[in-house]
Amino acid sequence: MERSGIYMAPPYQKSGSRRRLSDHRGTKLQPATLFVPNAPNLAPEVHFPLQTVSAPDRPPYPRFVNRFDSREILLVVDGSCVNNGRHGNKCEPPVAGCSFTFKGNPTSSLDPAPQPVTFPFRSTDPDFNNQVVKGTIAFRLEREGPLGQPIEHTSNRAKLRAVIAALQFRPWDAEGWRRVVILTDLEYIVSGATTWLPRWIKRGWRKRANRDLWEELQGIIEELRSRKCEVSFWLVTNEFESQFIGRTKAAARSAARTEGVEMEKFTKLCGIML
């Protein structure tokens, strides 16, 4: 049986970057959809309780599954940036952390406080091979975008990067899911992915921030849709509405503040048998 763990795909190359979304200006782009809760009064962790999923080719694994539709799962994302804004130290660059939660502990729905992942991952490292991968993955935002250009860290970018990492982490369509719901407390992410993106393209972007990540995200959404898996976004107004948001936010903050090896280049994280 294949060993479980987190592995890095080769860093992105400029020549392999996604098609620029300006190519869509003559066609109608189909953005992601908004998730409408089946029961609006339920907290996300009640609407998507942790359930054990069985599959013929691997051990049972936990996922946050919609109690009203067993073909839908929840992924929770967040990001944090330190040393930015007017109160930041102008002598030091901003440092951002990203995090996403894709499963929990069967006894408590959430793992104990997660430790940030340290780059680089090495499958030959004995500590790596013996690690127990928790359900929340946290990491430092890279210093380059998917097109290879240097970027400045911001909290918006960190959260957007977390969405991409979460959607790329597992082949969700191959697991059999027909909808992946992204839970976040940032309207910029939800409105951008579901409403604003076609407008930005129509207006020629006009120096819109994080264009590289928005193009990367839309490409992933279209790929999953082509495999019969829809991506939807669910906005909660603050972390107190959901334990999921609070725990994922804490992991992102920890990643931003923890000293460690940073990745320069934009890198895909792959969860194997998790």
For each of these PLM feature ranges, what is it?
Residues 5-11, 163-249:
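RNase H catalytic domain
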Residues 6, 10-12, 16-157, 169-172, ...:
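RNase H-like nuclease fold core
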Residues 32, 58-66, 222-227, 231, ...:
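Charged, low-complexity intrinsically disordered terminal regions and linker tails
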Residues 97-99, 247, 251:
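Aromatic- and glycine-enriched pocket-lining scaffold segments that form the walls
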Residues 158, 162:
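Loop-to-helix element that buttresses phosphate recognition and phosphoryl-transfer chemistry
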Residues 207-213, 253-274:
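Acidic, His- and aromatic-enriched active-site or binding-groove loops in soluble protein domains
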